[in-house]
């Protein structure tokens, strides 16, 4: 019996020696190479790492250093200096579902072509990582990313999974060519719906904060968005600048606030903009609203040859159209003031009271062509119910027949200036007088 006991003891000691030898061998470069080769040869993935570290002070954690992981024949999905895998008792029933995974000092590529990771975690943590999404609808590049995803259950084309809570911060981020710094995002993913409970960032020398939701059909609901002290320069025309708004099925704006911001493009600019918008839904090239409101003022607005100073606009939106409560601006040395309504039915703009005073306006060289050109679909008719003009100067520098009218005054009522998308004086009455005029270099008084 003593002999059998000794044999069992020797066998046990030998097994322990082999186990410990194998344990320490796995933590060498030789062990890392063999594990990497075994995974690469027996799966559809390629894996490399320099060394695996395990410490008895943290027995539930495995540490991999200088890790590269991805699908065979494709660029690496993950490159990280350190991967810390937290194990739990779950590994007895689900070996590929771990407690935590910490990715540190590396790059994670997210795209629809990305192959699914073969493992899951209750929590994925990122520390000083870079995120890229090449080839996806959201062109994303982020650096110095920290945060977490809970739970993390990646699928094909969805590195973050189908349902998870997200909390991320980034030192710098570029989304669809728009750069930002000090970014904070808190929200959730529920299949194709993305909820952004908190969004904050520094961008264009200003700040952005908001709450938004992306629905499964690709439409957006912006509950609240604030832009403060933005100084943005763009190389896009005004129509190109707003073109992304027409690419989504719809954009519902609950509340938009813009404060002390300046935007500039190649042929347009607005400075010192303050804007407040409520309850407006944009759908392709149309809009809908229930009790919507717009208040806006700026120091300067430029669009092509149009140059407005100190414009003020207050309007209300409804299913019937737009109630223009106030529009005032300084233009061409004078003042323009009006109010009225745009009616969706008939696409008619009716201005109740329009006043133009102190204008010094030189007609553009192609004003005759502009006069004959059809107007946009949204403007079928224009009627001035009440009109007044005071001390205006109008000049035409056409060398074939130059003319100018000085100190032009006038008033009118029910003037229909647009009919069927065409300029003209179609109906109404008006009285005009001037202190002096010159027609083809002939003075008239």
Regions found by a protein language model. Give the residues of each.
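Short, recurring structural edge motifs at helix starts
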Residues: 86-91, 171-172, 196-199, 241-247, ...
